[in-house]
């Protein structure tokens, strides 16, 4: 079955369950046949427990608090990505997909049963402080994250601009936990950034998949076409994902009309297909996609679809491996559910859940100590001849590069993968490899302008 990508809430079954739950709590019932009978009996027990707590617990408890706690527990038994959202949390999610919210600027997930940083958002307090993709958050302030749901962790990290929160990080290869005290800010996300590399290579940095990402990318590609650029690098490193529809809208600009981009499959086994809806076939110019362990979800849809159609070469390191689809389901009281409703598959039927996308060409980022030495060498040449103090390796960012946002001051020289500033091509060996490959590509094949 083909899906219109504009539809987001395509699975509504859980709403029925919650309606039945409310019905039982107020004394209503329904036909006791099949699974309904089993569910009814279980809900009778739930109602009895609720009644006993209200009658005998040592302190008076609000029914709303008990029911919300039960809902959270219900969703916690499913998977780390399913969660209940209070009305306040639900509103924040709606704001976030539009590109602005308050907090420290990291996307989180569950990996190896621990709260993990999928990616820091470029130019935010978390990124500037040196938090990296792959870090594990073991405490928020002094509270352990062991039993926190994803939504609860998000809530604890967000807050008013100017307020502070301390995250305790466990980093692979570092023996002791690392405390980071961050000052919250308004997180504004510009999803598409561009520049020209080596005179004729279009570079597109996609930081997240938002409602406007497809439109913004289309505008950027049209501009590059006017400049007659001959090849493109699509940088998805440290892109934690976003909207499924945005991933489809980005992918369809590189494949022929009617081509399958991704399909999702729920427990009923039905395939919902998302096809390219472009009217005209795009130019088939050389395309390289850069990925790393911070590339997740919607990023992996793009990084899976385009190679399946022979439209791109993937360079970098293995991606995060989040291959499940969460649907946001609004509830009558203004709250909502974030529920895993399906898994997604690339056009060739590959699932990336827990495995990720393995690049065609594996290139690991430059070690931070090498970057620090290179930076010191440059400073010695440019300065008065006096050597400068070496950069502490622990403070040298190793996440991939990107262009500074308009209106922001870029760092003097970012380390490879420092998205808050402009890393030089010489320092970013993953980007360097992409440029080298495109140069070779141009030698062996006549290229059409973009």
Task: Provide a role label for each language-model segment.
Residues 2-4, 26-42, 46, 51-63, ...:
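Cleft-lining beta-strand/loop regions that shape enzyme active-site pockets
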Residues 2-16:
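N-terminal Sec-pathway targeting helices
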Residues 5-7, 314, 415, 442:
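Cysteine endopeptidase catalytic domains of the caspase/legumain-like
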Residues 12-27:
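Hydrophobic membrane-insertion alpha-helices, especially the h-region
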Residues 34-58, 62, 66, 75-107, ...:
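Glycine-biased strand-turn-strand hairpin within the trypsin-fold
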Residues 57-118, 164-166, 170-181, 189-194, ...:
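Extended, small/polar residue-biased N-terminal targeting/export presequences
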Residues 336, 343-450:
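Conserved functional hotspot residues or short segments at active or partner-binding sites
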């Amino acid at each position: 079955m083909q899906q219109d990508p504009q539809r987001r809430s395509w699975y509504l079954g859980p709403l029925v369950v919650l309606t039945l739950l409310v019905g039982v709590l107020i004394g209503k019932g329904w036909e006791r046949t099949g699974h309904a009978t089993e569910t009814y009996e279980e809900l009778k027990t739930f109602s009895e427990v609720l009644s006993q707590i209200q009658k005998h617990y040592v302190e008076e408890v609000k029914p709303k608090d008990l029911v919300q706690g039960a809902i959270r527990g219900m969703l916690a038994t499913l998977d780390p990505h399913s969660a209940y959202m209070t009305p306040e949390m639900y509103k924040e999610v709606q704001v976030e997909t539009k590109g602005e919210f308050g907090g420290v600027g990291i996307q989180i997930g569950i990996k190896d049963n621990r709260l993990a940083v999928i990616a820091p958002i470029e130019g935010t307090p978390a990124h500037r402080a040196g938090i990296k993709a792959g870090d594990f958050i073991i405490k928020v302030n002094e509270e352990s994250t062991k039993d926190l749901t994803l939504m609860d962790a998000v809530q604890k990290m967000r807050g008013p601009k100017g307020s502070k929160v301390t995250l305790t990080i466990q980093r692979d290869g570092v023996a002791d936990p690392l405390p980071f005290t961050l000052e919250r800010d308004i997180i504004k996300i510009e999803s598409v950034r561009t520049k020209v590399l080596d005179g004729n290579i279009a570079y597109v940095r996609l930081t997240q998949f938002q409602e406007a990402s497809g439109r913004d990318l289309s505008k950027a590609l049209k501009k590059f076409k006017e400049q007659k650029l001959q090849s493109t690098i699509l940088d998805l490193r440290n892109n934690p994902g976003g909207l499924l529809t945005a991933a489809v809208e980005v992918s369809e600009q590189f494949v022929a009309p009617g081509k399958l981009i991704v399909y999702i499959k729920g427990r009923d086994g039905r395939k919902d297909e998302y096809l390219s809806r472009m009217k005209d076939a795009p130019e088939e110019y050389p395309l390289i996609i850069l990925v790393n362990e911070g590339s997740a979800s919607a990023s992996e849809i793009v990084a899976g679809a385009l190679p399946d159609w022979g439209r791109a070469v993937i360079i970098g390191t293995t991606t995060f491996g989040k291959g499940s689809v969460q649907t946001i389901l609004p509830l009558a009281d203004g709250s909502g559910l974030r529920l895993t409703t399906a898994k997604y598959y690339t056009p060739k039927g590959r699932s990336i859940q827990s495995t990720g996308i393995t690049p065609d060409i594996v290139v690991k980022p430059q070690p931070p100590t090498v970057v620090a030495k290179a930076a010191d060498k440059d400073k010695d040449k440019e300065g008065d001849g006096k050597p400068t103090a070496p950069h502490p390796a622990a403070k040298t960012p190793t996440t991939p590069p990107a262009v500074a946002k308009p209106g922001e001051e870029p760092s003097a020289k970012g380390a490879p993968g420092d998205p808050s500033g402009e890393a030089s091509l010489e320092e970013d060996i993953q980007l360097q490899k992409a440029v080298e490959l495109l140069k070779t590509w141009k030698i062996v094949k006549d290229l059409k302008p973009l």
